Regions:
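Amphipathic alpha-helical interaction surfaces in cytosolic regulatory modules
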Residues: 26-119
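STAS-typified acidic loop motif
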Residues: 1-43
Length: 123
């Protein structure tokens, strides 16, 4: 796995760096054991986005079965970090979701309420 990826027993994020997009594919269960590694991974992705001046991070949650509230709060913090960044380094988070998974529908709609300029949800 590359520097923008993570894997443990129950949770994985595999990331790919494109020209102006970073794609991160989540799978498994983002539970209490995922909080610290996910926080670190988000910081590394953010730093890479700023470094390469990417315009978007695509976050594919379609294979993610569960995410606890603490992990979801990390996304709220990430959005806040984007909003506080200088305009020339702001980027969009595009979530690919599974519309059949109820927690994704509810949580991502709430996250999108923070800003529709920098959070997009594709179902």
């Amino acid at each position: 796995m590359g520097p923008l990826s993570f894997h443990n027993r129950d949770f994985a994020v595999k990331s790919e760096i494109g020209t102006d997009t970073i794609r991160a594919r989540f799978s498994g269960n983002a539970d209490i054991d995922a909080i610290a590694p996910l926080r670190d991974l988000m910081a590394r992705i953010h730093a890479e986005v700023v470094r390469i001046r990417a315009r978007e991070v695509e976050i594919d949650l379609r294979e993610l079965e569960f995410m606890n509230a603490a992990c979801m709060k990390l996304f709220v913090n990430w959005v806040a970090e984007i909003l506080e960044a200088p305009e020339d380094v702001r980027y969009r988070l595009r979530f690919l979701s599974n519309p059949d998974v109820r927690w994704q529908r509810r949580s991502l709609v709430a996250l999108q309420c923070i800003t529709t300029d920098f959070v997009v949800v594709d179902r």
